[in-house]
């Protein structure tokens, strides 16, 4: 479940802790928000992909392949300007609310309306705050349609959906309940989550520690890990010492000299 985090972690070392928990050391200076629409950098992506579910994802065994996630299948029309996704049934958010096509549509629209870091690639495909409500829609339960605003290779759009990790399903009811002054819940999602992923956020203290616990109702099956802890360390040398002592399982982005 932590394949993407490990894939993008850079220099990584491993030690041993109890088999049902994972302790990860990293420099958390750049971990500024947990909002998928605002995330930048691999550190936050590695966390977000375990709190949320995407429509589709890359196959970690073959990164050129796209595989189902919340969407079980998809097709492109003959005109190659419309992608239709068919959603998996029975998936629930951590709140207990069902994951619906309306949640997926709202989540993608939110990216363009907020116009934060993750909006840039979608704007390059022609999506905008003005047209996204028309171009991204759910014509019926369990169906999500993405209409391309301008000529693009739909295979490239599909790959972007799978690779970027930004188009994840947010629990729209929960987020909207925490909306302040039309911010689409951005302030609340900076330090909270509203996902359906394999892990739930328990707590986060900036530049200190972030705790996750497993989602026992996860649609892919209950994760083997009961707990994941991210701890902040400023210096690479400290990470190396913690690995040597056996206090960390993984140390992210260590300097080459410490590996």
Which residues does each predicted region cover?
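Bacterial N-terminal signal peptides
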Residues: 1-9
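Short, well-ordered beta-strand elements
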Residues: 19-28, 72, 82-84, 104-108, ...
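N-terminal lobe/hinge region of extracytoplasmic solute-binding protein
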Residues: 25-78, 109, 116, 192-198
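Short, solvent-exposed loop/turn elements at domain surfaces
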Residues: 31-37, 58, 63-66, 94, ...
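Gly/Pro-rich hinge or "lid" segments in bacterial periplasmic/extracellular proteins
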Residues: 59-61, 162-223, 227, 237
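Aromatic- and charge-enriched surface segment that lines or borders ligand/interaction sites
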Residues: 73-118, 145-147, 155, 239-245
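Surface-exposed binding/hinge segments that line
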Residues: 86, 121-177
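Extracellular/periplasmic solute-recognition and catalytic clefts
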Residues: 118-121, 202-213, 229-259
């Amino acid at each position: 479940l932590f394949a993407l985090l490990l894939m993008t972690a850079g220099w990584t070392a491993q030690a041993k802790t109890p088999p049902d928990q994972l302790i990860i050391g990293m420099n958390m200076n750049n971990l500024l928000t947990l909002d998928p629409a605002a995330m930048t950098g691999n550190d936050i992506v590695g966390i977000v992909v375990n709190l949320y579910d995407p429509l589709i994802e890359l196959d970690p065994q073959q990164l050129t392949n796209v595989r189902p996630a919340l969407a079980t299948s998809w097709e492109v029309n003959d005109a190659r300007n419309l992608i239709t996704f068919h959603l998996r049934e029975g998936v629930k958010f951590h709140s207990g609310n069902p994951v619906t096509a309306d949640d997926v549509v709202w989540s993608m629209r939110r990216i363009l309306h907020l116009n934060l870091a993750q909006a840039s690639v979608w704007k390059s495909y022609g999506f905008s705050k003005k047209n996204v409500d028309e171009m991204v829609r759910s014509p019926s339960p369990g169906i999500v349609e993405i209409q391309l605003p301008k000529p693009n290779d739909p295979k490239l759009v599909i790959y972007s959906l799978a690779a970027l990790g930004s188009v994840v399903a947010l629990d729209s009811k929960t987020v909207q309940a925490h909306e302040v002054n039309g911010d689409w819940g951005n302030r609340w999602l900076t330090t909270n989550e509203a996902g359906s992923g394999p892990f739930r956020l328990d707590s986060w203290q900036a530049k200190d520690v972030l705790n996750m616990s497993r989602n026992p109702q996860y649609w892919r099956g209950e994760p083997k890990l009961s707990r994941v802890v991210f701890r902040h360390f400023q210096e690479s040398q400290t990470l190396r010492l913690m690995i040597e002592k056996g206090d960390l399982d993984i140390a992210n982005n260590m300097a080459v000299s410490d590996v």
